[in-house]
Amino acid sequence: MADKYNVFDQLGELENTLNTTLTQISGIRQVLESSMTENATLRMELEKLRDRLAEFEKKEVKKETPKDQPNPNLIQIFNEGFHVCHLHYAERLAEGESCLDCLELLYR
């Protein structure tokens, strides 16, 4: 008979242990759900930030590439009558002369 009471005691202890374990598992599940939700939110935010960064980089590249306009300093020197080409740099142009090398350098 003592064995039967011992079995009931052990069964009661097992039930208490299982309830404690179930409570711990429930807490872990809540933490995991919260972490997964936060992770998904952060991933979406990261994707948006990457898209914005790509837009800014495209705009930055566009700002750096306006090579349509020649260097204003070189234009001023050329208009004052001096060569700006590598071959004859700073030599005076003859009256009415235009140098193809200078023009190519200015307007490429």
From Swiss-Prot:
It comes from Lactococcus lactis subsp. lactis (strain IL1403) (Streptococcus lactis). Its main location: cytoplasm. Belongs to the YabA family. Zn(2+) binds at H83, C85, C99, C102. This is Replication initiation control protein YabA. Binds 1 zinc ion per subunit. Its cofactor is Zn(2+). GO terms for biological process: DNA replication. Keywords: Cytoplasm, DNA replication, DNA replication inhibitor, Metal-binding, Zinc. One of its GO terms (cellular component) is nucleoid.
